[in-house]
Amino acid sequence: MITFVGAGPGAEDLITVRGQRLLKEADIVIYAGSLVNPGLLKLCKEKCKIYNSAKMTLEEVLEVMVKGHGDGKEIVRLHTGDPCLYGAIREQMDELKKLEIPYEDCPGVSSFCGAAAALEAEYTLPGISQSVVITRMAGRLSLIHISEPTRLQLIS
């Protein structure tokens, strides 16, 4: 089985209990190295094959998934936050569907929730706001050289 797992918004202890279990059971883990906390890889068993997808193409990632599936391996595709929210997993799921390879999604704590917690903010307030709209800026935004407080404000 291939499972897309949400790693949470950064801190190692913000991955879900289910996500932890899937990492511990995985034979193969493909993680978004530029985004996922590498400390989470400590959960993997000793013989787990670990791939950093930061420099892999979609085709290379799929090749690892397809081969692993053919070998009967448990595969985790580890994405930051919640993979179903800006996780860029649609193209991977589409290809797996074409190949009739089963997969599932394990939700994670999204960065917008982590940002609210860090800022001690509440998104909805009775009589003030009952909705949350999630959107993002067009194009790529590098947050590497931005201070942590500013980064949290941008994320929220």
Where are these regions (language model features)?
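Internal, active-site/partner-interface "lid" segment
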Residues: E122-L143
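Class I S-adenosyl-L-methionine
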Residues: M1-V109, G114
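A generic local secondary-structure boundary/capping motif
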Residues: R18-Q20, V66, E120-T124, S147
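Glycine-rich, anion-gripping cofactor-binding loops and their flanking helix/strand elements
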Residues: L14-T16, R140-L143, S147
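Single conserved hydrophobic/aromatic residue that forms the stacking wall/gate
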Residues: I144-S156
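Short acidic/polar capping segments at secondary-structure boundaries
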Residues: P9, S110-S111, A138-L141, R151
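Structured adenosyl-cofactor binding patch, chiefly the S-adenosyl-L-methionine
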Residues: S111-Y123
